[in-house]
């Protein structure tokens, strides 16, 4: 899908050198909505256990807005770049459909220890079936059932094609319905 300049889309972007949270604060000031997938990290420091909430992917940020407006703000933030994919010989910014982004954010916001972030090339989507979760914490989320190399159980995947995927295990078979 080629994004139009005046169409509101979620754009997958990269804020180099791990500055995605700095960019997110700048975008808040500019009144532009953004999303950075976050996770809890627990580390032991001496005798204490410290829990931090950190970005799941160091440079990744999703920005909602008209491409023209994002370009304007991007001019003030030299380390913010579109993530692109080649289409017809051009590198086109990745625009994420609203419904897909809402599903992805819902899963990320409910993540627990059973969830993990998976790079796109580690998942073979052709073996999975499209399913909808009908119960539990992930009710109404749609994704695929897949087998990830090195994992014993099937996992539920919600992905943003070519960018990132969230993988969750522990969803009961009776909480799934096949779609499509």
Model-derived features with residue positions:
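Short coil-to-beta-strand transition motifs
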Residues: 127, 134-142
